[in-house]
């Protein structure tokens, strides 16, 4: 079981720098041949590219493998899970590749089909909006006879999954809110937080996350801590914000408690071995926090004019404005 570190400070520290370097080195070492996929693929590519630890030859190998896969599949990454396309768009945007021409296939185009994208519910809308906004892409035209997607439509779909308590649920009919999807929904909402209704929804979601945080600052797994840290950084909120420190410990401290020998991260505190997904999500979180501390754009904000929304968690409803 990993040993929890002491509480971190609000400024960039040697511990932060070393943690990011170790996480990046671990991913490079354990993913020698990146492929199209949620593990050993796009999240690793995104994390390494946005952290500054990316390797050009490694990224090119991913792209070549993706081209070969897309051509072998006739451009169909998945018949029903359109999050596959959104995830690929995020990775390609991060390494400077055009998702609209991957071996002759337009992998952005499926995000124009609102029905197919939202077949996966909240996940579909969140991933699609993140992907579209990451590169400032125009929403593709939907196929004939299908419902045309719009940014406004995806935004409304996401907000429909917010519970009265403020968190987001995977169940549109009022199921329990979940920290991971709440954090991801917050990232998708960020570019629209200049709207009073969106900023109020985001504030409510962050306050729900604050209440959901454990008494020791932990959200229950490496991946959950990572997602919350990414959401905080996206809004320019440091991990040490008073709303997210419990018993002197932040989610950043909690995440570092999941490090195992060798530089990887385990999924649960009782685990002794590194978990690939947890390690890649930790890399993303450490990248996001490092960028936030340096005053850089958020993890998913990859256009040149991308700013950082700033949210006052203590403001009254309607008082938040994007800065």
Please describe what each predicted stretch is.
Residues 1-323:
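Preference for long, amphipathic alpha-helical scaffolds in soluble/luminal domains
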């Amino acid at each position: 079981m990993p040993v929890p570190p002491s509480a971190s400070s609000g400024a960039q520290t040697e511990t932060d720098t070393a943690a990011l370097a170790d996480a990046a080195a671990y991913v490079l070492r354990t993913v020698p041949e990146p492929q199209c996929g949620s593990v050993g693929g796009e999240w690793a590519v995104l994390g390494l590219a946005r952290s500054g630890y990316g390797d050009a030859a490694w990224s090119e190998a991913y792209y070549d493998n993706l081209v070969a896969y897309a051509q072998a599949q006739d451009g169909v990454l998945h018949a029903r899970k359109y999050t596959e396309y959104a995830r690929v768009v995020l990775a390609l945007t991060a390494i400077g590749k055009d998702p609209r021409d991957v071996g002759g296939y337009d992998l952005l185009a499926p995000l124009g089909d609102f029905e197919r994208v939202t077949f996966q519910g909240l996940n579909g809308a969140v991933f699609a909006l993140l992907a579209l906004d990451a590169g400032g892409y125009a929403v593709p035209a939907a196929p004939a006879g299908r419902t045309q997607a719009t940014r406004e439509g995806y935004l409304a779909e996401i907000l429909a999954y917010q519970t009265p308590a403020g968190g987001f649920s995977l169940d549109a009919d009022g199921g329990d809110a979940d920290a991971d999807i709440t954090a991801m929904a917050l990232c998708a909402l960020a570019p629209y937080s200049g709207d009073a209704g969106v900023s109020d929804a985001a504030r409510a979601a962050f306050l729900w996350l604050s209440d959901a945080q454990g008494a020791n600052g932990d959200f229950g797994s490496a991946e959950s801590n990572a997602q919350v840290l990414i959401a905080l950084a996206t809004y320019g909120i440091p991990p040490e914000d008073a709303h997210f420190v419990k018993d002197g410990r932040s989610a950043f401290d909690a995440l570092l408690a999941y490090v195992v020998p060798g530089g990887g991260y385990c999924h649960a505190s009782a685990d002794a071995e590194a978990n690939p997904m947890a390690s890649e999500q930790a890399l993303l979180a450490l990248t996001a926090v490092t960028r936030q501390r340096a005053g850089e754009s958020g993890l998913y904000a990859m256009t040149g004019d991308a700013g950082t929304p700033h949210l006052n968690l203590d403001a009254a409803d309607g008082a938040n404005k994007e800065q």
